C-alpha cells in the first residue's frame, strides 16, 4: 500500500513513520531531477499558501517561496510587522481566518505550541519551518544529502558536535532514530538533549534498530562517524551575552581538521547554516575581537574542504520542502 499523507500537518518527525519519511526524501529527489532537467511540475496551480515568519530566515523562506512557485502555487509572506497574530488577534482566530483563505500554512518562530495550535485551529496542513524545539524540514534536506552520498542510511553514524539541546540536534536524534541510524550527541554534559526526548527516541530506536549515544568525549563522537554535523553555538532569540560562556564550553567541540581526521575517511560534513567559519560577518569579526578566535563551530578549512556538503544541503531544502507541500496538498 502506497504512502498517503494528504491533509496532514508537518510539525515534527515524531509524527511520521520511517516509510513516510523515506517517501518524502525520495519524492524530493524526484523533484530535484525534474528541476535539473527543466521538466515543469506545476501540479498545484489551484492552491495558495501563506508563510508566517516570527524569526528571520534566508534558506527556509527562499525554499518555501521557490518551491511553492515551482508547483504553481500563489504565496503570501507575513512577518510580525505585517500581521496581527498574537497582538490584536488571538492565535486561534488568526488560524481560523488563514485556514479559510489558504490551502496550507508555514510557520517559523519560537514556541512549538504555536505551530501545533495553528494546525489545531486552521483546518489545513501546517508546516513547521523551525521552532525552538524542532526543525523537521531541515532534517529531510540533511537526509537527502546523506542519501545522495551513501545510498542506504541504515547503520550510518551521524554525530552532532556542540549544543545538543537545540532544535537541530533534537530533530537529528528523531530522524536518525526513525531511519535506523546511529546518532551520537557529542558536547558538554550540561548541553545534552532533554531526558524526555531521549526516551522517546530510544523507544523508536528499539523498533528500527537505531542507536542513540550521548557523550562528552570527542574521540567517541568522531570514531567511525559517517556524517559530522554542527550548528552555531547561540541560537536565534538567545542573548549575545551567552557567547563567552558558550565559547568556553563548546570550543573543545569545534569541528576542525583534527576532528575530521578521527572520523571515517569518506565522512562528510554538514551544517544547517548560517555558519561562523570565518571573520566575514559582523558577528564573526566581533567574536574575533573579543575572544581571539577566527572561527567558531567549524574552521574555514573544513567548511571549504572536499568533505563539506553544506551547500548541497542548502539546495536540498528547496526540493524537500517542495515534497512536503506537494504530498500534503495534492
Regions of interest found by a model, annotated:
Residues 71, 101, 121-122, 179, ...:
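Short, structured coil segments at secondary-structure junctions
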Residues 286-330:
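C-terminal helix-to-coil terminal segments
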Residues 1-16:
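Generic N-terminal amphipathic, Lys/Arg-enriched alpha-helix
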Residues 203-299:
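Rossmann-like adenosine-cofactor binding region
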Residues 98, 118, 220-221, 302:
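Structural alpha-helical scaffold elements that stabilize or flank donor/cofactor-binding regions
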Residues 53-66, 148-231, 236-238:
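Glycine-rich phosphate/diphosphate-binding loop of Rossmann-like nucleotide-binding domains
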Residues 36-38, 42-147, 277:
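Phosphate/diphosphate ligand-binding glycine-rich loop within oxidoreductases
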Amino acid at each position: 500500500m502506497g504512502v498517503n499523507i494528504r491533509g496532514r500537518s508537518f510539525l515534527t518527525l515524531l509524527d511520521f513513520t520511517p516509510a513516510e519519511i523515506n517517501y518524502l526524501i525520495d519524492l524530493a529527489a524526484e523533484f530535484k531531477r525534474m528541476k535539473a532537467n527543466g521538466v515543469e511540475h506545476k501540479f498545484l496551480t489551484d492552491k495558495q499558501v501563506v508563510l508566517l515568519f516570527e524569526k528571520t530566515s534566508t534558506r527556509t523562506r527562499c525554499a518555501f517561496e521557490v518551491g511553492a512557485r515551482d508547483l504553481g502555487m500563489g504565496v503570501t509572506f507575513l512577518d510580525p510587522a505585517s500581521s496581527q497574530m498574537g497582538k490584536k488577534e488571538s492565535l486561534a482566530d488568526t488560524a481560523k481566518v488563514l485556514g479559510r483563505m489558504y490551502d496550507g500554512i508555514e510557520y517559523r518562530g519560537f514556541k512549538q505550541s504555536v505551530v501545533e495550535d495553528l494546525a489545531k485551529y486552521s483546518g489545513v496542513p501546517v508546516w513547521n519551518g523551525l521552532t525552538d524545539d524542532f526543525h523537521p524540514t531541515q532534517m529531510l534536506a540533511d537526509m537527502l544529502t546523506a542519501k545522495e552520498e551513501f545510498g542506504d542510511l541504515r547503520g550510518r553514524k551521524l554525530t552532532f558536535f556542540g549544543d545538543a539541546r537545540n532544535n537541530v540536534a533534537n530533530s537529528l536524534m528523531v530522524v536518525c532514530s526513525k531511519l535506523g541510524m546511529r546518532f551520537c550527541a557529542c558536547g558538554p554534559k550540561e548541553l545534552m538533549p532533554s531526558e524526555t526526548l531521549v526516551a522517546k527516541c530510544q523507544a523508536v530506536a528499539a523498533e528500527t534498530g537505531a542507536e542513540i549515544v550521548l557523550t562528552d568525549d570527542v574521540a567517541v563522537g568522531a570514531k567511525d562517524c559517517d556524517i559530522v554535523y554542527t550548528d552555531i553555538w547561540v541560537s536565534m532569540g538567545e542573548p549575545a551575552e551567552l557567547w563567552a560562556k558558550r565559547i568556553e564550553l563548546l570550543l573543545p567541540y569545534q569541528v576542525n581538521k583534527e576532528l575530521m581526521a578521527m572520523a571515517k575517511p569518506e565522512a562528510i560534513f554538514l551544517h544547517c547554516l548560517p555558519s561562523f567559519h570565518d571573520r566575514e560577518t559582523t558577528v564573526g569579526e566581533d567574536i574575533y575581537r573579543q575572544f581571539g578566535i577566527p572561527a567558531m563551530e567549524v574552521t574555514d578549512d573544513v567548511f571549504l574542504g572536499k568533505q563539506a556538503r553544506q551547500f548541497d544541503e542548502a539546495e536540498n531544502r528547496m526540493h524537500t520542502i517542495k515534497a512536503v507541500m506537494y504530498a500534503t496538498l495534492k
